[in-house]
UniProtKB/Swiss-Prot annotation:
Protein name: Cytochrome P450 709B1
Residues annotated as transmembrane: 1-21
Organism from which the protein derives: Arabidopsis thaliana (Mouse-ear cress)
UniProt note on tissues of expression: Highly expressed in siliques.
Record family assignment: Belongs to the cytochrome P450 family.
Classification via CDD domains: CYP709
Name of the top EC class for this enzyme: oxidoreductase
Cellular component aspect of the GO annotation: membrane
Length: 519
């Protein structure tokens, strides 16, 4: 009996010893070796702190930067949103190493290196590890996070949903939803008993509601009312994610029944139940499922053969992905473009003149119209440059690999700070921080000193599948608004405080004064 106890103690000591050794390797030895290895290549950065890395510094800098309020005419938002990048770039150069907990991250801002990494088709750079809260938001089995053969299968199934013919059909939905919003604005303006009535609108909220209605109707055949629970759950999950961003992520803790985890689980369950109701409604009402995004996904569920088949769980996760991405990206693009046009009345008038010339004052826009709206395209591209959807892109090296002259160790995350690249004066000229749509007069590839200086939708095989949808939606909405209303000015209470809440958005909303155009 004593021997059994002795052997059990030996085994226990060995297990504990191995755990301690593993923790030592992760927390101390690997960071030490990697730091020295990169230092030999001339790459340095802030000192690594055991367990936390540089998260405490990042949290402090972000907290301080979020107290600042920018001048509305300032488009230099990089220091406010990514203050740690700005500080460390000034100290260590544009390529530096920092630590997100125990995760090593190398920052690069060279567009050629960015293009090489994002265009890799061999799986050498994969999506970097995401926090559990982010995965819950759009699903682990959706297009955002899956890799390899699964990603190829999903992309092949989903591509037809964003074909030119399908987008033409979606445009009619965009027009109908926008007309509803504009009719509400018109009714509100008629209540003003003045010769030149004005109305005040919180444009960020207006665009969030509109784009949610459009994606729910055009992609899922539901409506904003039916999809409202999905959107509400996702907004709550987004808040959970942004709250956790600057905290150390300990593997396994997402399974513990903590108050925050229980809240996330409830929201996830609520969101999926709402999606299941939409799916069930479609299954009962249509024998052929339809040809929109949801219909294409359901056809994949009943398809024979692995190459074109999807499970119900995969369909639910893709629905999460497109419910979120389908309205968040465009609503922010519309909000920032509205802000810029409110500040730059000359460009607002140029767009209106172009719209009246090519589309008239009442004709609803269509795919033929969009190809003629050159100035509109230039303004939207400039808005994407200054206030893109995301602040940075990240990929993890799945093998030891060379990127340019850099030897990137396996497991290292490479980060491209898009806000820095999109405002770099060496790429965009001395007016890089100014609103100047004319830089896109000869197309995107000639707007800067490098053809891939603008990465708002990324490049390569994992470029945003919905970028054409976003562009057409933005053009549709802006065209119809400018046909009927004028952005007079930003309201006095507007605070220019762009913030990174998964996507870049106005921290305190976007109140704008509008005036209906005279007939």
């Amino acid at each position: 009996m004593g021997l059994v106890i002795f052997l059990a103690l030996i085994v226990l000591i060995l297990i504990i010893g191995l755990r301690i050794f593993k923790a030592f390797m992760i927390l101390v030895w690997h960071p030490f070796v990697l730091t020295r290895r990169l230092k030999n290549q001339g790459i340095s950065g802030p000192n690594y702190r055991i367990f936390y890395g540089n998260l405490s510094e990042i949290k402090k800098m972000k907290r301080e930067s979020h107290l600042s309020i920018l001048d509305p005419s300032s488009n230099d938002i990089f220091p406010r949103i990514l203050p740690h990048y700005q500080k460390w770039m000034s100290q260590y150069g544009e390529t530096f190493l920092y630590w997100n907990g125990t995760e090593p991250r190398i920052c690069i801002s060279d567009p050629e290196l960015a293009k090489t990494m994002l265009s890799n088709k061999l799986g050498f750079f994969v999506k970097s590890k995401a926090r559990p809260e982010a995965v819950k938001l759009v699903g682990s089995k959706g297009l955002v996070f899956i890799e390899g053969a699964d990603w190829v299968r999903h992309r092949r199934i989903l591509n037809p949903a964003f074909s030119i013919d399908r987008l033409k059909i979606m445009t009619t939905v965009m027009v109908d939803c926008t007309l509803k919003m504009l009719e509400e604005w018109r009714k509100e303006s008629t209540k003003e008993e003045t010769e030149h009535p004005k109305i005040k609108k919180e444009m960020n909220e207006e665009f969030q509601r509109l784009t949610a209605d459009i994606i729910a109707t055009s992609a899922f055949g539901s409506s904003y009312v039916e999809g409202i629970e999905v959107f509400r759950s996702q907004m709550e999950l987004k808040r959970c994610y942004t709250t956790s961003l600057n905290q150390v992520s300990i593997p396994g803790t997402q399974y513990l029944p903590t108050p925050s985890n229980i809240r996330v689980w409830k929201l996830e369950r609520k969101m999926d139940n709402s999606i299941k109701r939409i799916i069930s409604s479609r299954l009962q009402s249509k024998s052929d499922y339809g040809d929109d995004l949801l219909g294409i996904l359901l056809k994949a569920y009943n398809t024979e053969g692995k190459e074109r088949k999807m499970s119900i769980e995969e369909i639910i996760h893709e629905c999460r992905t497109f419910f979120f991405g389908g309205h968040e990206t465009t609503s922010n693009l519309l909000a920032w473009t509205t802000m810029l046009l409110s500040l730059h009345q000359d460009w607002q008038e140029k767009l209106r003149e172009e719209i009246f010339k090519e589309c008239g004052k009442e004709k609803t826009p269509d795919s033929e119209t969009f190809s003629k709206l050159k100035l509109m395209n230039m303004v939207i591209m400039e808005s994407l440059r200054l206030y893109g959807p995301v602040s940075a892109l990240a990929r993890e090296a799945s093998v030891n690999i060379k990127l340019g002259d850099l030897e990137i160790p396996k497991g290292t995350t490479v980060v491209i700070p898009l806000l820095k690249m999109h405002s770099d004066k060496t790429l965009w000229g001395s007016d890089a921080d100014k609103f100047n749509p004319m830089r896109f007069a000869n197309g995107v590839s000639r707007a800067a000193n490098h053809p891939n200086a603008l990465l708002a939708f990324s490049v390569g095989p994992r470029a945003c599948i919905g970028q054409n949808f976003v562009m057409i939606e933005a053009k549709t909405v802006l065209t119809m608004i400018l046909q009927r209303f004028r952005f007079i000015s930003l309201c006095d209470e507007y605070k220019h405080t762009p913030v990174d809440n998964v996507t870049i958005q106005p921290q305190y909303g976007l109140p704008v004064m509008l005036q209906p155009l005279e007939d």
